[in-house]
C-alpha cells in the first residue's frame, strides 16, 4: 500500500509515498538478546506421572479393575440413586456375571453335548440381545443415557439373579419336593424384585418424566425371563 502526497511543484499532481517509509530511518545498533526459561511445575509433572498407567504392572492393573468391579457390585446390592455406574461404566462386571450365570444354568448331563451348549449360548443371547433392545428403546424414548452406560447398568443388576441361581443350585442338592420348590420360588421373587429396584434406581432419572413407565416395562420383562430360566432349572 502507498500513501498519496501533493508534489510541491505541481499542486494538482500527487506522488505516491510508501506507507512505512518512515521506518527505514530507524536502525538498531546491535541485537538485543531475549533471555529467559520456560519452566514446568514439578507438581504437575508428578501428577501426570501418577495418573499415567503406562508404567503400571499387570497385577496392579488387574487388582485396580477388580476393586472397581467390587465397588459397583456394592452399589447394586445397596441400590440408591447414584451416578457411579453411569460415570465409571465398564463391561467387565456384566461379562463376569453373564459367564457365571451361564455356567450355573448349564445342565450336568455329559451324555449329550446339546444339554450344555444351547443353555450356555441361550443365556448370552438373552442377556446381551435383551440389554441392547432395552437400550435402543430407551434412546428412542428420549433418554439421555449412552449405549454402553445402559449395558453396564443392566449387566451389573443381574447380580441378585446370579446370587439366586447359586442359592437354587444349593437347594437342588436336597431331595426335590414342594418345600424345595417354594424355597426356590421365594428366593427368585426376592432377587427379581431386587434387580428391578436396582436398575430403576440408576436408569429412572435418565428418562423423560412422562415416559418412565415405557422405559421400565422392558426392563421388567428382561429380568423376568432370566428369573424364569432360574426357577425352571432342573439339573440332570
From Swiss-Prot:
- Lumenal side residue ranges read 106-115, 168-184, 234-236
What is the annotated localization of this protein?
Answer: Golgi apparatus membrane
Keywords, A to Z? Answer: Acetylation, Golgi apparatus, Membrane, Phosphoprotein, Transmembrane, Transmembrane helix
Superkingdom, natural source: Eukaryota
Q: GO biological process: what's one of them?
A: endoplasmic reticulum to Golgi vesicle-mediated transport
Functionally, this protein is described as follows: May be required for stable YIPF1 and YIPF2 protein expression.
The family note in this entry says: Belongs to the YIP1 family.
Name of the protein in its database record = Protein YIPF6
**Source organism per UniProt:** Bos taurus (Bovine)
Q: Which gene encodes it?
A: YIPF6
Amino acid at each position: 500500500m502507498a500513501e498519496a502526497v501533493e508534489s510541491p511543484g505541481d499542486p494538482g499532481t500527487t506522488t505516491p509515498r510508501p506507507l512505512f517509509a518512515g521506518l527505514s530511518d530507524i536502525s538498531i545498533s546491535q541485537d538485543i538478546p531475549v533471555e529467559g526459561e520456560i519452566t514446568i511445575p514439578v507438581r504437575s509433572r508428578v501428577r501426570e506421572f501418577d495418573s499415567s498407567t503406562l508404567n503400571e504392572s499387570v497385577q496392579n492393573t488387574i487388582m485396580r479393575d477388580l476393586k472397581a468391579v467390587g465397588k459397583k457390585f456394592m452399589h447394586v446390592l445397596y441400590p440408591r440413586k447414584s451416578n457411579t455406574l453411569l460415570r465409571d461404566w465398564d463391561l467387565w462386571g456384566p461379562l463376569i456375571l453373564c459367564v457365571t450365570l451361564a455356567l450355573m444354568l448349564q445342565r450336568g448331563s455329559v451324555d449329550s453335548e446339546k444339554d450344555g451348549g444351547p443353555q450356555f449360548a441361550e443365556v448370552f443371547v438373552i442377556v446381551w440381545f435383551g440389554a441392547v433392545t432395552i437400550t435402543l428403546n430407551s434412546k428412542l424414548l428420549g433418554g439421555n443415557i449412552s449405549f454402553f452406560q445402559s449395558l453396564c447398568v443392566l449387566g451389573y443388576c443381574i447380580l441378585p439373579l446370579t446370587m439366586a441361581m447359586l442359592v437354587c443350585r444349593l437347594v437342588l442338592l436336597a431331595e426335590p419336593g414342594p418345600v424345595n420348590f417354594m424355597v426356590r420360588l421365594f428366593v427368585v421373587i426376592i432377587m427379581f424384585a431386587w434387580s428391578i429396584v436396582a436398575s430403576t434406581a440408576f436408569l429412572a432419572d435418565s428418562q423423560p418424566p412422562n415416559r418412565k413407565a415405557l422405559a421400565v416395562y422392558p426392563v421388567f420383562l428382561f429380568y423376568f425371563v432370566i428369573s424364569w430360566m432360574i426357577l425352571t432349572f432342573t439339573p440332570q
